[in-house]
């Protein structure tokens, strides 16, 4: 079952962050053609709310922190009962969480480390197995599961190279490599390298195509959607009529439908859209209320999808103290 999930962060008082913020996870209900809240909880003010859902067991995994913490830890919540567990007790920074074939994966920087790297989380021992604990130079970005290759798609660059005079003062572009990495983290297959532009996000569209959002330089200019032909290594821009900028996206497994967070021409608000590459049909997907900040968009493929019958799981402040 293919499920579209959108992560947003809303101000609890509806106006500003004075009273804190909450993580809200929406799932798109194809039957009603509407977003429905499946999970809501207050989160720490410094947290990047990485999350993923195990729909078979109706459990959400998410990064959060107690009010006095400036670092992340991993939590789980049973969507049926609201039971919350804190699964780690360290100083982490999570960029991505993925649930694939019954296993929880993370892209995470652990305590005393600068860079994020892929890790596999053992739910029984509640411990991480990292790709390479000795490597604190390689940044791993845009961690996603590639259903076509049955491996992970990853974007990497060197922290040391990023800080060189050539990159920091001249090009302002981090040389990056798009690669496949298997579930053991031992076998890596490079697919594409460039330092002609800054790659922000990558996702597999079909057998021979990767889509990516790019910027002319680091944190500079509007994001552009590009298409990479893996075989020929040719790159071309993908223009979406009526859209001035695509910030993040996720393709459907049909190889044609693209879900993305973007800005319409002449607008400043970010919205979620569905776009058909063949017909160029563009549809805005609406929320019950406009989110304060759209953080992430992802598509999961699992044996089952959301169970809307038990409604939304809403946690109060004490959920963070368990």
Where are these regions (language model features)?
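A short loop-to-beta-strand structural motif that recurs across blades of beta-propeller domains
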Residues: 22-26, 73-75, 117-119, 176-179, ...
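Blade-level signature of beta-propeller repeat domains, shared across WD40, Kelch, NHL, RCC1
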Residues: 271-273, 280-322
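Repeated scaffold domains used in trafficking and secretory/extracellular systems
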Residues: 45-52, 92-101, 137-147, 196-204, ...
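Short coil/turn segments that connect the beta-strands within blades of beta-propeller domains
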Residues: 1-3, 56-58, 101-103, 149-151, ...
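Beta-strand-rich domains and repeat architectures in extracellular enzymes and scaffolds
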Residues: 1-27, 41-52
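Surface loop/turn motifs at the tips and blade-to-blade linkers of beta-strand repeat domains
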Residues: 39-44, 87-91, 132-137, 191-196, ...
């Amino acid at each position: 079952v293919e499920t579209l999930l959108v992560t947003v962060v809303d101000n609890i008082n509806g106006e500003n962050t004075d009273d804190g913020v909450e993580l809200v996870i929406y799932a798109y209900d194809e039957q009603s053609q509407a977003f429905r809240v499946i999970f809501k909880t207050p989160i720490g003010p410094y947290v990047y709310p990485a999350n993923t859902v195990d729909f078979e067991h109706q459990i959400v995994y998410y990064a959060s922190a107690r009010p006095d913490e400036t670092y992340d830890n991993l939590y789980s919540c049973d969507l049926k009962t609201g039971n919350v567990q804190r699964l780690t007790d360290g100083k982490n920074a999570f960029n991505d969480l993925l649930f694939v074939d019954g296993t929880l994966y993370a892209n995470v920087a652990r305590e005393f480390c600068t860079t994020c790297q892929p890790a596999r989380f053992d739910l029984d021992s509640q411990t991480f197995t990292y790709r390479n604990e000795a490597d604190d130079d390689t940044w791993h970005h845009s961690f996603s599961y590639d259903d076509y290759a049955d491996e992970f798609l990853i974007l990497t660059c060197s922290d040391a190279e990023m800080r060189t005079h050539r990159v920091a003062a001249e090009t302002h572009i981090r040389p990056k490599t798009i690669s496949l990495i298997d579930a053991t983290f031992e076998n890596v297959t490079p697919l594409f390298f460039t330092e002609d532009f800054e790659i922000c996000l990558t996702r597999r569209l079909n057998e021979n195509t990767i889509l990516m959002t790019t910027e002319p330089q680091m944190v500079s200019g509007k994001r552009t959607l590009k298409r990479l032909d893996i075989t020929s290594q040719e790159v071309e821009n993908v223009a979406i009529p009526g859209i001035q900028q695509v910030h993040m996206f996720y393709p459907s497994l049909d190889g044609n439908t693209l879900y993305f967070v973007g800005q319409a021409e002449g607008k400043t608000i970010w919205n979620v859209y569905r776009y058909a590459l063949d017909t160029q049909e563009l549809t805005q997907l609406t929320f019950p209320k406009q989110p304060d900040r759209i953080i992430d968009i992802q598509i999961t493929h699992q044996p089952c999808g959301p169970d809307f019958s038990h409604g939304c799981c809403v946690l109060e402040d004490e959920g963070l103290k368990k």
